[in-house]
Each structure stands twice: as structure tokens, then as C-alpha cells.
Amino acid sequence: MNNVTERYVLDLQEIDESQVAVVGGKGAHLGSLSRIEGIRVPAGFCVTTDAYRRVVAQSPSLDAQLEELSRVSPDDQEAIRTLSAEIRRTVEEIAVPDDLAGAITRALARSGERTAYAVRSSATAEDLPTASFAGQQDTYLNVVGPAAILRHISRCWASLFTERAVTYRRRNGIDDRTVRMAVVVQQMVFPHASGILFTADPVSGNRTVATVDAGFGLGEALVSGLVNPDVFKVRHGEVVARTISAKQREVHALLAGGTREVPIDAQRQQQPALTDAQAVRLVELGRRIEARFGRPQDIEWCLVDDDFHIVQSRPITTLFPVPESADQENHVYVSVGHQQMMTDPMKPLGLSMWQQTAMVRMHEAGGRLFVDVTQRLAAPASRAGLLDLMGRGDPLVRDALETVLDREDFVPSLPDAPPAGPRAGAAPEPVATDPAVVTGLIERSQASLAALRRDVLTKTGPELFDFLPTAFEEHKRVLTDPLNFKAIMAGMEATWWLNDKLEEWLGEKNAADTLTLSAPGNVTSEMGLALLDVADVIRPHPQVVEFLAGVEDDDFLDELAKVPGGTEARDAIEAYLDRYGMRCVGEIDITRPRWSERPGTLVPVILDNVRNFEPGAARRRFEQGLQQARKKEQEVLSRLRALPDGERKADETKGMIDRVRTFIGYREYPKYDIISRYFVYKQALMAEAERLAQAGVLAEKEDVFYLTFEEFHDVVRTRQIDDRLVRQRKDAFRAYQALTPPRVLTSDGEALTGAYRRDDVPDGALIGLPVSTGTVEGRARVILDMAEADLEAGDILVTTFTDPSWSPLFVAVAGLVTEVGGLMTHGAVIAREYGLPAVVGVEQATRRIRDGQRIRVHGTDGYIEILS
């Protein structure tokens, strides 16, 4: 083989998955497939990325076109459409150099020039473990003759710039100038049947269930949607379900090259494309391929004379990963993010820090954290307690868990264990209804936090990392104080008691929502009201308002002081940040930028408050809530006294109202304490990262976000970092951003989101969990980023989740709809505190409700109507 051929053409037998940069993702996979014993891969070769680079270098105009494309927004589809079409034309018009054409022709001659081939694109960013580009570049079947093959190779090069492929790369942060295209040229096989094998169920995620899609003829009939496939579900070597479709057409190869659609005889349309035995045998081959690549695969196959040929295999990148387990037993995991109102992926340092400081062991998968509840589901008493608690908080979690429990033998039965938690509505823990209990807890927390701030100042380098585990233990000691748990549960149980008893006695739903308005000591609701006070300072100064409207970065506070009225405005903002600046969206991830680090995040909210409220709004709002709560209390007690045994019922209810108002505000304080400590940890850790960056150990200080706490410690100790590991973690994090975490996940990989089992809502309504009573109609504002908020009075906030950092927006809206949440999650608590009708846990709310639509939120009954 001469040097030109060696550089530009590689036989599939010469290729493995380490050569992605040379032969692209598809080529690397096919080369690896051809090395697996028992797997038949059609013979062929790969035209390398060096050939692509050689060809496109002949067109000076291409660099300018790619530079222009790099500046286009991924949302500007018209510009992408126009530019990508121009680039494709440019690439197709470039002549293939004679020496390259000769190398390709010589490779073809080994099988005979009249042999039919499939010509397939293979991009360097394609079919990788973290991103599958299926269908984004072109494949041409039954291509015959050197001239036709060279022409179709050029078309494959050009298909690197299809509109869909460019948009995908732009959205996933992949530079179009860095990707290269190889081309796979494989001998055609002419199958009786063909299709796709998923070695894991692509819908449920279950790794034990393989799905086979099958049709007659070439696979293009399935890929193009020309026919509905036969579907076989195979588990543990047995077909457990099959659907045989009426297959009216198939795609055949033409003798002269190309393909055509042909009708299928009526008597053959209902015949299965595969027998059960063939489907099982195909899955066995798929399991072998899956084992070779180490993850579930999406495999294209052809059946010729009862032999399966594999023409492509790529990772299934849409599956949610499964937590690692030390055994082979069944496990059931519950999402932590759904309880914490933060379902975005976390970076490795964030995951590691939350695990270090958590009260229970947590398992990582897909950049999220999960708790293993298998043991608690196994025994009747603990199962009942867990399901009751989950059912009160998030019915979708309970439904998902019950779905798993309905599967025979998935969760083994164990003898009774103590209940997982107190039964909802039961008598509260024996803690006195005394505000001094809450005051004492807060004082002890503040003293511990002050000691942490003092002690951490003296620690750097390895000494810091030796100290922090001790700080984590103190962190957990404060949180696990038995009185802390009793105070939190007292407020929650009193809420449940009031809602249960007042619905039973008076027929009134969710009465506690009104009875808890303006409850004292809620640090999160106080945070939202405090930003109204900041707006009061700014409102009288038009030049300050104008200055803030033009803020584009986070270094604005010093410049603000130079504007008339700016000193007072700066002082008010800084005072707010001193108390609440440790907070941010997704605050359980220590790597997320805090308000103190990015104060510009708050500017749009401040300006909305300036525009939408009159001076003194915070005080008035609190007083209005307080008066509503008192009025409701008097009304409820009066109605109870008119009932049989009314005095007893009224006395018990009065005690519970006092109890809920004493303790429910404290529900938000432990999270405030956690995040306050996190900011102290972060400041110390980032000072260390800054020193490492200045010393040249780190390329940038934020690289430590992609290390665990222990790995960060090792870097500080050794002054060395594994740059390759950091790059891999960054790629994985980008992939995790495209995944939606399930509420419940099994060790088989099955992702369960749960369902609402209700038939009491209007047709077309969106169902959710009612968490704050009342009905409101208004304009939907679909907001995914708090920094982009633009709200007016009467708007209804629609978003994915709301952790405590969103509470400043709550003061400006009339209602709340979220995709994630439960009865006692932070957004629900604050919605009740502010008297906002709210429905949470509405699946895909941000997609099903369009920004600007008029909607009606039924916060008492738990559904949303779209009005326009």
C-alpha cells in the first residue's frame, strides 16, 4: 500500500475506536465491530479525515464562510439555512485530487468496480459516548462505479453542513471549524429484512429489555418512516411482547444502482419480518456488541439467508445513566433534585460537596443525586411511612414507587422495620409551641456559622482540606439536632392536621394556606420582601434607574456610586447581598455563581419592583397577609364552634393554628444555614483554585469544578492535575444537560416519572399538585432564567423549578406553575406565604404553555386551563 493510500484510505479491519479523529465516529465503531468474534460486518474501507482536510483546503472561500457561521446564533434558523446551503455547494464543487481519487479507486478494485456499495458519512463529533448524531449527515445506498462513488463521497463531505447538523453543533457548543468528515464505503448487502436493535428500551430506559424494530427489504423504509415496523420486546432470552404491523411497502436495490420503493403483496404484509427465534438471536448478538462498547447500543442490522449483518452501531445517548452499585441486587432510587427543586445537572465538585454534607448516602448518575430507598420499600411499616410521606409531598413520586412495587419480586420483602417517617396527620412531636424554640435554634446555628467563618480564614493549602471535613461534621451536627427535626416536623404536621381536619369538619380544602400567610421568621419570604425595600431606595432616583437598565456585567456597584443617588442605591444592594448574597439559582451546587459573585442577576428583578410597586409595598404586603390569616382564623373558629362538639374542635384547631404559625416559617431556615456554609466553603476553595491558576497548575480556576473534593485535595497536595480527566468531565456535563432526570430510577435503568390518577379535571387541562389555594387568571410568563425576568403585575410565572433564590420574583406575580415540586418544597411554601395560587409538578409545563398565553391556575384543585 503506497503512502497516499495509507494516509487517505484505511480498511475497516485496520480501524478501532481509538481512531475517531481519523475515521470519525461511525468508522471507528464499524472498525471495532469488525473485530468482535461472531459479528458479521460488510467489508469496506474508510476515506479518512485527512482526505477531507486535503480537499477543503483547496477552497479559500470556505474559511470565510465558516467564520461567518461561527457568529450566527443557534436560534437564527434562517441564517443557518442560508449559510449551510452555501457551504454545502462550495464543498461539493471542489474537485477530488487525482492522487486521492486513485487511492479510492484502488480500494474499490479489491472487490471489483461493479460491486455495489453503501457510502456513509462519518463525522468526528458523531456517535460518541456523549452525543449521537444519528441521521444528521447523509448515507447513500447501492452506489455502483468509481465515478458515482467519488461523487457521493463529496456529497457526504458536504453533508457535514446540513442545517440540522449545524444547528445541533451550535446548540451543543461544538465549533463547526473543528469537526472533520470521514466517509465509510461498505459493500452492500441485500437483505430479506432489516431494522434497528436497541439493546435497552429507548422509551423506559430498562436495560434488561431489548427492542427490535424490523421490516422487509432495506432499512431505509423504516428510517424514513415509510412503514411502521414490527416491534419485538426481548427480555432474558425470551420475546415478552410483539407488535406485527401491516407493512405495505419496502425499499429494494436496483441493478444499475440506487433504490426504489415497491409495494408488498397483500398476503405478505401481515407476516412478521422476523421469527421470535431470530429476534432472540439478534438480541444475543446485540448483547455481545453492548459488552464490547460498555454501554447500550442502537444497532442497524440486515438479515441475509438467516445470517445477521451489522451495518452500524452507536451509543444510545438519550438513556439516563444508572447509579453504580456494589452488588447485583435490584435497587430503587428516588431523585434528590426533585425534593430540592433543582433538577439541573451538577458539576463533580457540587455533587461531591453535597454528598460530603448530606445526612444520608447519595448515589450519582447523570450529574444528579439519588437516594436508594430499596430497604425502606421492602418492609411493610417503613414502606407505608415512605409512601405516605411521598404521597403528601409529591404524588408523582408515590405513583412511580407504587408502579415498581406492583412488579412482582422486584423489591424483596423484609420483616417490619421502624416507619420511614411520621405518619402524615398524626399527633405532632412533643415539642412545645414556643417561639423560643425557634429562636434558640437560629442562635445556635448563627454561632456555629460565625465560628466557621473565623476558623476557615486561617487555613490554606493542605491544611484547608484537612480542616473542611471537620467543618462538614459540624455542619451535619447542626442539621441533625433532634430539636431541629422536631421543629420542622411540627410545622409540617400541623399543616397536614389543619388541612385534613378542616376539610373533614368544614368541607374546606387547604385552609392552612391562608392560615399561614405572613407567618413570622420565614427567611426566604423575607428575602423577597427585602428586595422590595431595595427598590424603594432606588425608585426616587431616575438616573440610578437609567444606569441599572444599562448594566451588562457584574462589576457595576462602584460605578453606580458615581451616579446621583447611587451611593444610597449601592449601599442598599450591598446590604441585601450581605444577608442573602450566598443564594443563587441551583444553589445546592456549590459551583453555581452566587448573587454576591454575580449581582447583575438581581438587577432585572429590582427594576421590575421599581416599575410594578409603590413605596412601602413590602410592609403593606406583610400586613395584608397577616390580616387575612387572622380573619381566616376567626372565621374557622366561629364555624367550628357552631358544630356538634364544637368547642373541643375549635380549641384543638386554635392550638394547631398557633403551632403552625410558630414553626412553619422555620421550615426555610435550615436551607439558609446550609447555603450560608456552602458560600464559606466556596470562598475558601476558590481562593485555593486562584492560587493554583496563578501558579500554572490550572488552565483556569473553574477547572476545579470538574473534580471531586478528594481530587481537588490531591491537586493541592501534588500540584498536578489530569487535564484529560477535566476535558472528559466537561464533555460529560454537556451531555447530562440534555437529559431529564426521572423522579424514580431502578437499577435496571427504568426511568419512572409517575402519573396523576385523576378524572376530576376539565378536558385539556394540565394536571398538577395543588400547593397554594386560590384561582387566578393572567398572562403566562415562561421564564427559564431568573436573570431574564421581565414581569408585570398580574403575570403568572411558569418555570421548571423554583428553589429559594426565585422568591424575589414571587412578590411580582399573581400565580405560579412549575414542572417540579411538592407540597412542602420551597416554592410551595413561599407561594403559600405570599398567597399565590400555585400548581406544581406539571409535566412539561414550560413546553405545553407558551409565553404570553392567558391561563387560569386552579391552586385549590390542582390544574391549569389554557384560555388563549
Swiss-Prot record:
Upper lineage: Bacteria, Bacillati, Actinomycetota, Actinomycetes, Kitasatosporales
Family listed: Belongs to the rifampicin phosphotransferase family.
A GO BP entry: response to antibiotic
Enzyme class: transferase
Binding residues annotated for ATP, in chain numbering: 26, 120, 135, 139, 186, 300, 312, 314
E.C. number(s) listed in UniProt: 2.7.9.6
Top-level taxon in the UniProt lineage: Bacteria
Native species: Streptomyces sviceus (strain ATCC 29083 / DSM 924 / JCM 4929 / NBRC 13980 / NCIMB 11184 / NRRL 5439 / UC 5370)
Reactions catalysed according to its record: rifampicin + ATP + H2O = 21-phosphorifampicin + AMP + phosphate + 2 H(+)
InterPro entries in the cross-refs: ATP_grasp_subdomain_1 (IPR013815), PEP-util_enz_mobile_dom (IPR008279), PEP_Utilizing_Enz (IPR051549), Phosphohistidine_dom_sf (IPR036637), PPDK_AMP/ATP-bd (IPR002192)
Primary role: Catalyzes the phosphorylation of rifampicin, also known as rifampin (RIF), leading to its inactivation. Confers high level resistance to a variety of clinically used rifamycin antibiotics. Does not show phosphoenolpyruvate (PEP) synthase activity.
Molecular function GO terms recorded: ATP binding; kinase activity
Effect of gene knockout: Disruption mutant fails to inactivate RIF. Mutant displays a modest twofold decrease in RIF minimum inhibitory concentrations (MICs) compared with the wild-type strain.
Region annotation Swivel phosphohistidine: where it falls in the sequence: 768-866
Domain notes: Contains three domains: an N-terminal ATP-binding domain, a large central rifampicin (RIF)-binding domain and a small C-terminal swivel phosphohistidine domain that harbors the conserved histidine residue essential for phosphate transfer.
Keywords: Antibiotic resistance, ATP-binding, Kinase, Nucleotide-binding, Transferase
Annotated spans, Disordered: 410-430
Record-annotated active site: 826 (tele-phosphohistidine intermediate)
Region (ATP-binding): 5-317
Spans annotated as Rifampicin-binding: 330-755
Protein name (database record): Rifampicin phosphotransferase
